[in-house]
């Protein structure tokens, strides 16, 4: 966005800071990832993990989940008040994988949440370091975005499964704060709002009384977050209507679904940040690097540089392709699940294939999977170029939004056209233009019809060599303009289930 007036950058959101200059932001983000690294090293010591085991992404995820669970106040309170059989509300744990006699073994560990909180605070100068926790949540969310499809969730709320490119951050927990809200896609916000409205329709007391007042405040806040993602006046005006509705019901659901569809062409601004697994930060801290002193950014060259020199391993199931597993994790690390495959492939320097062609399941291993046949391999997370992550939807100029494509929400600020099948998208817009939002709907449809698939977005923006840390010589790639690349076409991945 050109107007950086009152907006805080995402690093500021990420670190909970007020307005800071670039150096202060780099230092506080550095402090945040440094804290994650120190925590990870300490956990590896506690668990007596070997160097190799500490670089295993599955172990990293277990350790990350433990600290997130230890700080989940709401759930902890709930567990204490509703004791369930065999679940100790004061403990947290998960599978840790160890190498024994040339084989991988699974060991289930349990820790006091209090102990985990102590280690985390100790690694973060005695503070709760909520920003670091949110950072881990966003990494898990990015991994889910790359791994699972949300078709069922979309259909349940009355949306079209082809709108999956709008679903970034759909598995983020509610407590992920401003940094979490920034990375949520338009579809994710719409889905949260629809669920809320549906509860209100079914439960007479949802909007009533003291609780109802809090619910109403949450509803309006979510509406404002979504409004802030839209870049055209008509879309924003429609959001005002939805927010101000006295008694939100089916009319509002209709409006929200209309807005979600419109976002396929008039794209919303959704932040992208490269959040890496804790073990990567741990490796770097262990090598003596001082993140806080050197500074760090989630949207520049830094994450690329870290991945360039970090060796991370993953468990591999018998019929999985290690190269495909690497692609999945690479996409998750750069929050590129909804990026155009042409752009991702160019940056990565190897062809990034659509998910329907991947021979790999998710990164996490279920507790009933057989460890006897598990192997491990190095994840190839390096890239050929780096590019700046974007916060815009790639609309060509501020007011008139540009072409979009079913299934692209740009991650990298790199010049390209955003091809789309206008007929497919516009077919969804027949019918209802009456009612109180008719003029806005008409205006939105008019803008969508005038969008051209050959329009170039991010004009003049290119990728950079990894040696070019100041981003002085952009390499502007040329893409085959006709051939769009969406990760989710012809998809057969499994659903995300909590």
From Swiss-Prot:
Motif Bipartite nuclear localization signal positions after renumbering to this chain: 198-216
Chain positions covered by the region annotation Disordered: 1-21
Gene Ontology terms: cellular component: helical viral capsid; host cell; host cell nucleus; ribonucleoprotein complex; viral nucleocapsid
Single Gene Ontology MF annotation: RNA binding
Gene Ontology biological-process annotations: symbiont entry into host cell; viral penetration into host nucleus
Compartment(s) where it occurs, according to its Swiss-Prot or TrEMBL record: Virion; Host nucleus
Function: Encapsidates the negative strand viral RNA, protecting it from nucleases. The encapsidated genomic RNA is termed the ribonucleoprotein (RNP) and serves as template for transcription and replication. The RNP needs to be localized in the host nucleus to start an infectious cycle, but is too large to diffuse through the nuclear pore complex. NP comprises at least 2 nuclear localization signals that are responsible for the active RNP import into the nucleus through cellular importin alpha/beta pathway.
Alphabetized HAMAP family for the sequence: INFV_NCAP
Family: Belongs to the influenza viruses nucleoprotein family.
Protein name according to UniProt: Nucleoprotein
Gene name in the database record: NP
């Amino acid at each position: 966005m050109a107007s950086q007036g009152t907006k805080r950058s995402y690093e500021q959101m990420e670190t909970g800071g007020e307005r800071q200059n670039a150096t202060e932001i780099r230092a506080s983000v550095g402090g945040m990832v440094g804290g994650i690294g120190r925590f990870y090293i300490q956990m590896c010591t506690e668990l007596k993990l070997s160097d190799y085991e500490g670089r295993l992404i599955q172990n990293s995820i277990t350790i990350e989940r433990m600290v997130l669970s230890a700080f989940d106040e709401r759930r902890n309170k709930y567990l204490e008040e509703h004791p369930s059989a065999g679940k100790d509300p004061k403990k947290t744990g998960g599978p840790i994988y160890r190498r024994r006699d040339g084989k991988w073994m699974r060991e289930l560990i349990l820790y006091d949440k209090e102990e985990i909180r102590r280690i985390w605070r100790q690694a973060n100068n005695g503070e709760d370091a909520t920003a670091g926790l949110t950072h881990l949540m966003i990494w898990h969310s990015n991994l889910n975005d790359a791994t699972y499809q949300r078709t069922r969730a979309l259909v349940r709320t009355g949306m079209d499964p082809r709108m999956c490119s709008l679903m970034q951050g759909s598995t983020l927990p509610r407590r992920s704060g401003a940094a979490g809200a920034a990375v949520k896609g338009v579809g994710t916000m719409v889905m949260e709002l629809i669920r809320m409205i549906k509860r209100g329709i079914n439960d007479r007391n949802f909007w009533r009384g003291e609780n109802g007042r809090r619910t109403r405040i949450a509803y309006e806040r979510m509406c404002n977050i979504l409004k802030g993602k839209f870049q055209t006046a008509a879309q924003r005006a429609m959001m005002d209507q939805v927010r101000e509705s006295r008694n939100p019901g089916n009319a509002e659901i209709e409006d929200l679904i209309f807005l979600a569809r419109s976002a396929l062409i008039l794209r919303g601004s959704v932040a992208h940040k490269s959040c890496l697994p804790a073990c990567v930060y741990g490796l770097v801290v262990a090598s003596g690097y001082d993140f806080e002193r050197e500074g760090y950014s989630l949207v520049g060259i830094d994450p690329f540089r870290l991945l360039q020199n970090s060796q991370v391993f993953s468990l591999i199931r018998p019929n999985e392709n290690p190269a495909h597993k690497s692609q999945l994790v690479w996409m998750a690390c750069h929050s590129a699940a909804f990026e155009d495959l042409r752009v991702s492939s160019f940056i990565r320097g190897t062809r990034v294939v659509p998910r329907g062609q991947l021979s790999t399941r998710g990164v996490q291993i279920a507790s009933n999977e057989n460890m006897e046949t598990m192997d491990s391999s190095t994840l190839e997370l390096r890239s050929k170029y780096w590019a700046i992550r974007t916060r815009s939807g790639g609309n060509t100029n501020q007011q008139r939004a540009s072409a979009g494509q079913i299934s692209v929400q740009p991650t990298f600020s790199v010049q390209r056209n955003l091809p789309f099948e206008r007929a497919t998208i516009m077919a969804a817009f027949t019918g209802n233009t009456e009612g109180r939002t008719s003029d806005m709907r008409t205006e939105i449809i008019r803008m969508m019809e005038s969008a051209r698939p050959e329009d170039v977005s991010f004009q003049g923006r290119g990728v950079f060599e990894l040696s070019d840390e100041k981003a002085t010589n952009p390499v502007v790639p040329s893409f085959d303009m006709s051939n769009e690349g969406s990760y989710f076409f012809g998809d057969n991945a499994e659903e995300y289930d909590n």
